[in-house]
């Protein structure tokens, strides 16, 4: 992936975010964040009080009140800036995608076949079901399915990957995306969406996040913050009559400052930015999430369903051994296996030819000179081979060869059954070779488990995540590979129905399930899974069923998706812990200062020995504003993430963000108080 990464504080983004922060000062924008709306009202109230004091309409220190008012407005601006900067980064990423959209014309065919009469129409007028022709050099005008032809397609504008991909009719590689370019040949495409509903349109809308809905956890946290704010609002409101009864009423400006320092403004100001940044980080991994809900669900996932091929193993099975049947020498088996594989262009077939050459110096023969009939592999027969000089040689799965032998009046040897089981237990795939009705032996095809994958699964296990390998292999082979890879469980001989049933079973147990898929047959399971990552190279049905799309089409990305989701949840939790711990420290600064005149005994709480009541209150308000700015990078980048158990993670966060939240305000408020005193500002 080569998509350009944005700097955290890109100058143009910062300038734009500052402008947006000022625009967000209007009440319509502010009421969406209840905590910051209280600060906004406090800012407005203290501004009015400052003006009244300056005009002589009210008694009091107009300069002090104006300073408090100014820093309260700055607090609101900083919170707006954090959200605007996160949104600006997402919009910048969306703008790079908008550059892919081009106003162009399309050749709309009157009949669904190559060579039919074509009408030139604007691409944005194409409707679902329309048939278009695209040739080398053309931009594909719509999302759709290839119904005829095959071509090399440059998808770098969407995926960031420069290597072209093949798109052709039939199978799982028939889906094309509007905005990509044909490099060679031609395609006849049936449009699958209406204007404004293309994959690119959805990507842009999702990335911009203009209509980003709050996730369930975000709503729950917002309710908690509102509850805390109401409690502190009521507590602060009752303080005025107490102080008035004591003979020295506390000013409204001080009460507003006290309220703002008590309520959780830090997390209140950063909450939206954390959510927007989570989706932005997902895009940085080249994964498009349909909503923040999908990203959040990724953080709560506790079961991963992983395809064996390409995710756990390298996916290119290689012939590793010839195991002859009783009474057959290994060279005879190798010669027959090589002959049966001469026309087999699959990686497995080529590896059989090469292994026979390496073991017994059996040179690859000229296919044309053999005057033989080659039998291709089909899904029905599940075997392939060659007919040459009255010899009928076949290689294939155990069941297919067994049926072939019995159909030709032969008997499948018991010793070969044992050898098949032995190969399967070692994690390899057995292919049986037969000549006529005589079974010659077994070829072991070994799929290599990816390096480091066992360690990654161990990390996931530490985090309480169960890993389940999905494979079409038989149970013996699946069990051996599962043991080698270190997964917790496996589903062998998997079918779409079996996958769907397994997901429902885990969900019935109260678990959240994540999986990947690329084919139409994966669509039901993708639709059922809590986190469903569809491959961009997959079918349209798979992409529509999933709630995320991996532009790199890398099944291993599912593990990274879970990490990003957990990092977002950890960031939100860590900053909430820091914010609430912050408030405890601010009590010691502002409460003694606010009520020292009325209740001198409260001076015992002035453990920071701040210069004066005015400097203490102003220092706390200034710190309350500045801490939001200092935490913006953490909100956007996310807290440092390490795979740990839930209890270990909780202890770590309490030490770092709980204790840090207690200590930092003591230091910060004291330093600000000293600076105000030295500069003679209080």
Curated annotation (Swiss-Prot):
Key words, A-Z: ATP-binding, Cell inner membrane, Cell membrane, Ion transport, Magnesium, Membrane, Metal-binding, Nucleotide-binding, Phosphoprotein, Potassium, Potassium transport, Translocase, Transmembrane, Transmembrane helix, Transport
Active site (UniProt): 307 (4-aspartylphosphate intermediate)
CDD domains listed in its UniProt record: P-type_ATPase_K (cd02078)
Top-rank taxon, per record: Bacteria
Catalysed transformations (reactions): K(+)(out) + ATP + H2O = K(+)(in) + ADP + phosphate + H(+)
Keyword Oxidoreductase among UniProt keywords: no
GO molecular function, one term: magnesium ion binding
Segments traversing the membrane: 34-54, 62-82, 219-239, 254-274, 588-608, 616-636, 656-676
Any GO CC annotation of this UniProt entry: plasma membrane
Pfam families tied to this protein: E1-E2_ATPase, Hydrolase
Residues reported in the UniProt entry to bind ATP: 344, 348, 377-384, 395
Function: Part of the high-affinity ATP-driven potassium transport (or Kdp) system, which catalyzes the hydrolysis of ATP coupled with the electrogenic transport of potassium into the cytoplasm. This subunit is responsible for energy coupling to the transport system and for the release of the potassium ions to the cytoplasm.
Subunit comment: The system is composed of three essential subunits: KdpA, KdpB and KdpC.
Family, per entry: Belongs to the cation transport ATPase (P-type) (TC 3.A.3) family. Type IA subfamily.
Name listed for the protein in its UniProt record: Potassium-transporting ATPase ATP-binding subunit
Species annotation: Escherichia coli O9:H4 (strain HS)
Lineage, opening ranks: Bacteria, Pseudomonadati, Pseudomonadota, Gammaproteobacteria, Enterobacterales
Name of the gene: kdpB
């Amino acid at each position: 992936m080569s998509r350009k990464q944005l700097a955290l504080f890109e100058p143009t983004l910062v300038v734009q975010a500052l402008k947006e922060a000022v625009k967000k000062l209007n009440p319509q924008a502010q009421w969406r964040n209840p905590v910051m709306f209280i600060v906004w009202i406090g800012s407005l109230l203290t501004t009015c009080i400052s003006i009244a004091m300056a005009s002589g309409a009210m008694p009091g220190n107009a300069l002090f009140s104006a300073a408090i008012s100014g820093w309260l407005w700055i607090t609101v601006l900083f919170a707006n800036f954090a959200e605007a900067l996160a949104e600006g980064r997402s919009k910048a990423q969306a703008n790079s995608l908008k550059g892919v959209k081009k106003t162009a014309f399309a050749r709309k065919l009157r009949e669904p076949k190559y060579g039919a009469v074509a009408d030139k129409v604007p691409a944005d007028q194409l409707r679902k079901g329309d048939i278009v022709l695209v040739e080398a050099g053309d931009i594909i005008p719509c999302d759709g399915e290839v119904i005829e032809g095959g071509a090399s397609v440059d998808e770098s504008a969407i995926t960031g990957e420069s290597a072209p991909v093949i798109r052709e009719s039939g199978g799982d590689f028939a889906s094309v995306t509007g905005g990509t370019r044909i490099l060679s040949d031609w395609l006849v495409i049936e449009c699958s969406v209406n204007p404004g509903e293309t994959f690119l349109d959805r990507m842009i809308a999702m990335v911009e996040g203009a209509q980003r809905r709050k996730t369930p956890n975000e709503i729950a946290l917002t309710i908690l913050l509102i509850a805390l704010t109401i409690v502190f609002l009521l507590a602060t409101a009752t303080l005025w009559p107490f102080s008035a009864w004591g003979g020295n009423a506390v000013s409204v400006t001080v009460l507003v400052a006290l309220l703002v320092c008590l309520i959780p403004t830090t997390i209140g100001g950063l909450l939206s930015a954390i959510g927007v940044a989570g989706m932005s980080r997902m895009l940085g991994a080249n994964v498009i999430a349909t909503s923040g809900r999908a990203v959040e669900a990724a953080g709560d996932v506790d079961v991963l369903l992983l395809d064996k091929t390409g995710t756990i193993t390298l996916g290119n099975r290689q012939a590793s051994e010839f195991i002859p049947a009783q009474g057959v020498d290994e060279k005879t088996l190798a010669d027959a296996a090589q002959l049966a594989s001469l026309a087999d262009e699959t990686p497995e077939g080529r590896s059989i030819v090469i292994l026979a050459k390496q073991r017994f110096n059996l040179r690859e023969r000229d296919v044309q000179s053999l005057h033989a009939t080659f039998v291709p592999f089909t899904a029905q027969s599940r075997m392939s081979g060659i007919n040459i000089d009255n010899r009928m040689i076949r290689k294939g799965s155990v069941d297919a060869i067994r049926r072939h032998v019995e159909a030709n009046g032969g008997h499948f040897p018991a010793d070969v059954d044992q050898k098949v089981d032995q190969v399967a237990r070692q994690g390899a795939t057995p292919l049986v070779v037969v000549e006529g009705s005589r079974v010659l032996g077994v070829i072991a095809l070994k799929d290599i488990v990816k390096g480091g994958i066992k360690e990654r699964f161990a990390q996931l296990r530490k985090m309480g995540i169960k890993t389940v390998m999905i494979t079409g292999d038989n149970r013996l082979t699946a069990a051996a590979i599962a043991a080698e890879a270190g997964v917790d469980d496996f589903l062998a001989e998997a079918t779409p129905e079996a996958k769907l049933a397994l997901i429902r079973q885990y969900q019935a147990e109260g678990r959240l399930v994540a999986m990947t898929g690329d084919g139409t047959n994966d669509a039901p399971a993708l639709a059922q899974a809590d986190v469903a990552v569809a491959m961009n190279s997959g079918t349209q049905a798979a992409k529509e069923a999933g709630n995320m799309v991996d532009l790199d089409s890398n099944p291993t990305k599912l593990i990274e998706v879970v990490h990003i989701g957990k990092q977002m949840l950890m960031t939100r939790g860590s900053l909430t812990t820091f914010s609430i711990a912050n408030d405890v420290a601010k009590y010691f600064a502002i409460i003694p200062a606010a009520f020292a005149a009325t209740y001198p005994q409260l001076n015992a709480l002035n453990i920071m020995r701040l210069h004066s009541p005015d400097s203490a209150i102003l220092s706390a308000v200034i710190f309350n504003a500045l801490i939001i700015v200092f935490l913006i990078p953490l909100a956007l980048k996310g807290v440092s993430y390490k795979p740990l158990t839930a209890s270990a993670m909780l202890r770590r966060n309490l030490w770092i963000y709980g204790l840090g939240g207690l200590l930092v305000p003591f230091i910060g408020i004291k330093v600000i108080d000293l600076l105000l005193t030295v500069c003679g500002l209080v």
